[in-house]
Amino acid sequence: MGLLSILRKLKSAPDQEVRILLLGLDNAGKTTLLKQLASEDISHITPTQGFNIKSVQSQGFKLNVWDIGGQRKIRPYWRSYFENTDILIYVIDSADRKRFEETGQELTELLEEEKLSCVPVLIFANKQDLLTAAPASEIAEGLNLHTIRDRVWQIQSCSALTGEGVQDGMNWVCKNVNAKKK
């Protein structure tokens, strides 16, 4: 088999499908992040009442991103989406310090869910474009992320609005798709 036929075969190989669950409190920036990933207009975003799904091609993967609303009344339904999740992305509003405790409790509960057991988790410390935003290191310390031992995880500073840090986080996602610990 010649080099050209090998390259053709590689090029025609279908992208590996990856199911990504995008969670976080209401107003954390999940939908803005999703639209940023899909290179869509982010000028008019309304609170997600149910869910949004977008497929994004990245580094040989077809990333199927499920953005689930974060309002308190919707959160009990999050568990309906846990099945077959390959990566969990949890978005935090870094500028809303009054809700750090609440967001920490939600994240802790997610990490204890059996259906999300060992699923790699990327925490986006969003809204870093705001002057009041806490740095990712402060959030990591406040949420005791260093105690996570049953999975690979990463915290990434970002601004879904400007796009800063988003690609770095998605690079981590693509590198860790197959890191689900058994």
Curated annotation (Swiss-Prot):
Disruption phenotype: Lethality by 3 weeks of age. Mice exhibit abnormal development of renal, hepatic, and pancreatic epithelial tubule structures. Mice show abnormal epithelial cell proliferation and cyst formation. Moreover, they exhibit photoreceptor degeneration as early as postnatal day 14. It is found in: Golgi apparatus membrane; Cytoplasm, Cytoskeleton, Spindle; Nucleus; Cytoplasm, Cytoskeleton, Microtubule organizing center, Centrosome. A lipid is attached at residue 2 (N-myristoyl glycine). InterPro entries: ARL2/3, P-loop_NTPase, Small_GTP-bd, Small_GTPase_ARF/SAR. One of its GO terms (cellular component) is ciliary basal body. Mg(2+) binds at residues 31, 48. CDD domains: Arl3 (cd04155). GTP binds at residues 24-31, 48, 67-71, 126-129, 159-161. SMART domains: ARF (SM00177), RAB (SM00175), SAR (SM00178). It is a peripheral membrane protein. Keywords: Cell cycle, Cell division, Cell projection, Cytoplasm, Cytoskeleton, Golgi apparatus, GTP-binding, Lipoprotein, Magnesium, Membrane, Metal-binding, Myristate, Nucleotide-binding, Nucleus, Phosphoprotein, Protein transport, Transport. Changing residue 164 to A: Reduces the interaction with RP2. Belongs to the small GTPase superfamily. Arf family. This is ADP-ribosylation factor-like protein 3.
